[in-house]
């Protein structure tokens, strides 16, 4: 026993000596001379918290001092009493360029108080003041989005920092908390809370899809997707939303989301156990009908923002004339009213029947009787686009007022143009949504007939919208060209006609043959106007004046593509030519009734291809649906607005059949209505799934047969 007691006493002495040595205390338990007191300045303690943990050399024991030194409790030790304002974190988890939403900032004082209260009562621990969405998406130094950082382990975050004991450079952090200042040049984004897919019930809606209204630009209806004709994806759970990419001059929404709550997720559907009693096909039909309802609500929500933020803006109104204001917004109030009435009827049907019988009759009635404001709005599109471009380029006051409005959180960081084109987008998507509903009702003859009638009614409306837009554009073009073309050197041609419109116009090099040499000017010397029935060859005198040299009817024209190496020399022989991209146009019967040959050259291969396609336009009409199944298809990834007559305007998510590729440009046929034209290749991605390609062709066939498009 004595030996055991001696060993215990020795262990206590050694332990006491170790504590005093490591904490650098004197015999009385106080800090040794030269060391800061425990209750010193916060700055000294803060700095000390980041010093390396290096054991201090053992202090010599005072002579004659044999009793053990007093033990200091851990809660009263200098380490426990330190109140630092710094923290070392892995560099991989720190992003200096990440902008936080100012509304979510929390003062340091409030944070300290909340921690003290939580220490006394854990139930008072507040919820985090940051959004997980802020941590979910980040950008690496190359600008690429990196996702799921919140799921990244601490070990993965430490990768690349070296071992804990390495000789890496220390990161010096400022001990002061810096307030984040708002950047006035950066557009406000929508609140992160609006990006969360939630079924949170509000007091007024009880789990309604109205709880979290989304902008129509941010969603893509599942009914537009034909990659799986079985449409199993329409039953999938909603994927977590991604942040919308910053919008530049081109309207791009990288992260389309499903249209809010699905029918299967509705509380009344879940509580009543309806899903257990339905077949898979009936559930798909209910989802297709409900998606028309929810997407109409999103569309109506975006139209309301266009009216409240842009149309009714006094600042914007003060920078434009009354005519310019009318051209910009046209009859958008009538369009909004039509959408509200349509949505009210759909919602009333949904409230009356959780398991909706049908909505085809509602859509048919509105397409035939109430959607006529869409025709007037679409007919004004050419004036709308031209007025907007003119104001942005020449009106600084308008440009500044518009920029301020687009920064508002309600606009979601999107430009006004994305709101102005919404009626065109919605009216062209409705036939595709109705086609999906038709597929879901094929097993029920009466429902299928009703859906087919609704599809024909809405497709007829779309055709009227397209014709109205083309008619106004063509009429204005013909009147303008009538004043610019001078026929004084040739027999006059009555240019204005209701059945004539411009296909393409532009400058080309006219190659002239002089003796043994072929001469090409350093600048374009020929300006062509190609209409649907006649080709007019002119010489440009000014920006608004052209002297007509010759013309010929389209059925009296032959076109031949020629490679530079194939050009014969005027004196005979064949050798490489200096003409870069030549092609030959033969006027079999010109304005004087004789044959004339024109050797033309363009400045690029794509321009030559576009001219040849336009000049042979009538010869390409023979290709039928049967041969289009083997053509490549693309999906449009960002909206493209036609700037020339031979280009085609495309919306994001449009599907196009590719008829020709040339030098970064694609010539294709828009699936939804058969419109053809050129567009840049980098605005689209090729569809590689054979199932999706075949599904798109079948959808095109149905739309053409059912609606006579």
Swiss-Prot record:
The keyword Cytoplasm applies. Residues 191-207 have a biased composition (Basic residues). The keyword Amino-acid biosynthesis does not apply. Residues 629-689 form the SH3 domain. CDD domains: PH_ephexin, RhoGEF, SH3_ARHGEF16_26. Keywords: Acetylation, Cytoplasm, Guanine-nucleotide releasing factor, Phosphoprotein, SH3 domain. Induction: Up-regulated by HPV16 E6 (at protein level). The modification Phosphothreonine is found at residue 226. It is found in: Cytoplasm. GO terms for molecular function: cadherin binding; GTPase activator activity; guanyl-nucleotide exchange factor activity; PDZ domain binding; receptor tyrosine kinase binding; small GTPase binding. PROSITE patterns: DH_2 (PS50010), PH_DOMAIN (PS50003), SH3 (PS50002). Residues 22-70, 114-146, 180-246 are annotated as: Disordered. Gene3D superfamilies: Dbl homology (DH) domain (1.20.900.10), Pleckstrin-homology domain (PH domain)/Phosphotyrosine-binding domain (PTB) (2.30.29.30), SH3 Domains (2.30.30.40). Residues 501-620 form the PH domain. InterPro entries: ARHGEF16/ARHGEF26_SH3, DBL_dom_sf, DH_dom, Ephexin-like, PH-like_dom_sf, PH_domain, PH_ephexin, SH3-like_dom_sf. Guanyl-nucleotide exchange factor of the RHOG GTPase stimulating the exchange of RHOG-associated GDP for GTP. May play a role in chemotactic cell migration by mediating the activation of RAC1 by EPHA2. May also activate CDC42 and mediate activation of CDC42 by the viral protein HPV16 E6. PANTHER family: GUANINE NUCLEOTIDE EXCHANGE FACTOR, RHO GUANINE NUCLEOTIDE EXCHANGE FACTOR 16. The PDZ-binding motif mediates interaction with TAX1BP3. Interacts with ELMO2, EPHA2, RAC1 and RHOG; mediates activation of RAC1 by EPHA2. Interacts with TAX1BP3 (via PDZ domain). May interact with CDC42; stimulated by HPV16 E6. This is Rho guanine nucleotide exchange factor 16.
């Amino acid at each position: 026993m004595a030996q055991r007691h001696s060993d215990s006493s020795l262990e206590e002495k050694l332990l006491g000596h170790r504590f005093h040595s490591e904490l650098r205390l004197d015999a009385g338990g106080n800090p040794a001379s030269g060391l800061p007191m425990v209750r010193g300045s916060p700055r000294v303690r803060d700095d000390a918290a980041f010093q390396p943990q290096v054991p201090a050399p053992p202090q010599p024991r005072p002579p004659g001092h044999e009793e053990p030194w007093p033990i200091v409790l851990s809660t009263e030790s200098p380490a426990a009493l330190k109140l630092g304002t710094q923290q070392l974190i892995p560099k991989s988890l720190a992003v200096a360029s990440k902008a936080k939403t100012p509304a979510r900032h929390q003062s340091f004082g409030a944070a300290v108080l909340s921690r003290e209260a939580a220490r006394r009562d854990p139930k008072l621990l507040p919820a985090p003041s940051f959004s997980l969405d802020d941590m979910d998406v980040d950008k690496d130094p190359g600008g690429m989005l990196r996702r799921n950082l919140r799921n990244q382990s601490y070990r993965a975050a430490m990768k690349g920092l070296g071992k804990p004991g390495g000789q890496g450079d220390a990161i010096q952090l400022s001990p002061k908390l810096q307030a984040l200042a708002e950047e006035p040049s950066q557009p406000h984004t929508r609140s992160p809370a609006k990006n969360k897919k939630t079924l949170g019930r509000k007091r007024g809606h009880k789990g309604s899809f109205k709880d979290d209204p989304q902008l129509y630009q941010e969603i893509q209806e599942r009914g537009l997707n034909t990659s799986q004709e079985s449409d199993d994806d329409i039953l999938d759970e909603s994927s977590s939303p991604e942040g919308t990419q910053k919008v530049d001059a081109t309207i791009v929404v990288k992260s389309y989301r499903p249209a809010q709550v699905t029918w299967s997720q509705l509380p009344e559907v879940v509580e009543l156990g309806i899903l257990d009693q339905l077949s898979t096909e009936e559930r798909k039909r209910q989802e297709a009908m409900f998606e028309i309802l929810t997407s109409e609500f999103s569309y109506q929500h975006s139209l309301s923002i266009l009216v409240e933020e842009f149309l009714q803006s006094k600042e914007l109104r003060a920078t434009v004339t009354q005519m310019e204001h009318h051209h910009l917004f046209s009859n958008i109030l009538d369009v909004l009213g039509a959408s509200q009435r349509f949505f009210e009827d759909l919602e009333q049907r949904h409230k009356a029947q959780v398991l909706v019988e049908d909505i085809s009759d509602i859509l048919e009635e509105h397409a035939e009787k109430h959607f006529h404001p869409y025709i007037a709005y679409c007919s004004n599109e050419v004036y709308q686009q031209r007025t907007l471009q003119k104001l942005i380029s020449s009106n600084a006051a308008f440009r500044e007022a518009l920029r301020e409005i687009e920064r508002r959180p309600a606009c979601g960081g999107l430009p006004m143009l994305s709101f102005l084109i919404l009626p065109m987008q919605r009216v062209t998507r409705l036939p595709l949504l109705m086609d999906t509903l038709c597929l879901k009702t094929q097993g029920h003859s009466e429902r299928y007939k009703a859906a087919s009638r609704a599809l024909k009614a809405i497709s007829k409306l779309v055709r009227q919208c397209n014709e109205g837009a083309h008619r106004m554009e063509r009429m204005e073009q013909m009147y303008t060209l009538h004043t610019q073309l001078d026929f004084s050197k040739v027999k006059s041609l009555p240019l204005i006609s209701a059945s004539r419109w411009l296909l393409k116009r532009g400058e080309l090099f006219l190659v002239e043959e002089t003796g043994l040499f072929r001469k090409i000017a350093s600048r374009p010397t020929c300006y062509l106007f190609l209409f649907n029935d006649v080709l007019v060859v002119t010489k440009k005198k000014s920006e608004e004046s052209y002297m007509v040299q010759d013309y010929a009817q389209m059925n009296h024209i032959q076109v031949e593509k020629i490679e530079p190496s194939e050009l014969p020399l005027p004196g005979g022989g064949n050798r490489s030519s200096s003409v870069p991209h030549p092609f030959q146009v033969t006027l079999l019967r010109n304005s004087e009734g004789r044959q004339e040959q024109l050797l033309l050259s363009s400045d690029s291969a794509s321009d030559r291809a576009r001219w040849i396609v336009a000049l042979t336009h009538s010869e390409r009409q023979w290709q039928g649906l049967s041969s289009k199944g083997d053509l490549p298809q693309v999906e449009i990834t960002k909206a493209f607005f036609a700037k020339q007559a031979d280009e085609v305007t495309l919306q994001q998510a449009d599907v196009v059949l590719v008829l020709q590729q040339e030098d970064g440009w694609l010539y294709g046929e828009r699936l939804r209505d058969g419109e053809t034209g050129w567009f840049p290749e980098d605005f689209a991605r090729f569809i590689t799934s054979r199932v999706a390609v075949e599904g798109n062709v079948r959808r095109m066939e149905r739309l053409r047969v059912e609606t006579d498009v």
